[in-house]
Amino acid sequence: VYPGELHLIYSRDLQRNSILADAMLGLAPVTRGGIRFLGEDWAELSGDAACRLRRGVGRVQREGNWMETRSVMENLLLPLRHHTLIPEQQLRTSASDLAQRFGLPGLPLQLPGACATADLQRAACIRAFLGRPQLVVLEHPALSGDRDLIRPLMESIQQVRRRQGAVIWFTEHLSLMSDRGIPADRRYRIDSNQLHEWETDQ
């Protein structure tokens, strides 16, 4: 995946896609070959070096990965508070701007368990795009089929691409694969654990 590219991948196996996303980020071993990010082979990095490199990655995870004892807002802000030098006010402003883009009135103050599923999906997208990531991995960000999420999602994706970041998007929706309004550089499908080019007549 080159800087500025969007790769769209069709697969209905959500668990396998999460394992694949983990492997892309050096969080799961690969049996053959290697995976590099910004020229670095994950397998050759120390734990600290790998953690530093992952600071440049945003991700929407299938299971949400929420800390249940912290508000959704704290879940969004804590990683960047710990891993970047972005001033607190700038961080809050950026998060609030993304919240408005994704159709939320503000940053959710409830605990994750008290939030509606649709709001949590939007919050997961906010977290993934917050902080100018160099790579964004989206695991089924519109799992519920929420079409209202696609427009702000595409706006955020295009913003990442304009600053030469890359996006890998897993989807289980056939309609998205054939949607030419999504300017993907590559379209793929996963079949029998193999990655295949997407045929336009599918």
Language-model regions, residue ranges each:
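Conserved catalytic loops of ABC-family nucleotide-binding domains
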Residues: 156-177
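Conserved ABC nucleotide-binding domain
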Residues: 98-116
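Conserved ABC transporter NBD signature motif
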Residues: 33-43, 139
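Helix-to-loop junction immediately C-terminal to a conserved catalytic motif
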Residues: 25
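ABC ATPase nucleotide-binding domain signature
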Residues: 12-13, 56-66, 70
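ABC ATPase C-loop
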Residues: 128-129
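Q-loop/switch helix immediately C-terminal to the Walker
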Residues: 63, 69-82, 94
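ABC ATPase NBD coupling module
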Residues: 42-58
